[in-house]
């Protein structure tokens, strides 16, 4: 389930929680992917692009490879939506 949906569809609330989460773990690529999606939902495309770029530039993490792969796939789809 995606972050905004977990919060009743409240993208602004999702942004707040995801930003706090990233302060604790700035390398969490799936949180960044979810944050990018929430930014797109609130028409904050520049900020979404920064998060997308951060996910795509993240070094491989063997410990979290499946999650990182999912995050990359998610942001690639978001990137297409941004154009």
Question: Over which residues does each language-model region extend?
Answer:
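Short coil/linker segments at helix-helix boundaries
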Residues: 1-23, 50, 59-72
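Extended alpha-helical scaffolding segments
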Residues: 41-45
């Amino acid at each position: 389930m995606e972050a905004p949906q977990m919060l009743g569809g409240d993208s602004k609330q999702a942004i707040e929680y995801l930003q706090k989460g990233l302060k604790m773990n700035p390398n969490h690529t799936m949180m960044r992917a979810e944050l990018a999606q929430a930014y797109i939902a609130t028409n904050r495309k520049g900020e979404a692009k920064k998060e997308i770029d951060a996910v795509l530039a993240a070094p491989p993490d063997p410990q979290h490879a499946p999650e990182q792969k999912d995050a990359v796939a998610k942001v690639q789809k978001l990137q297409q939506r941004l154009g």
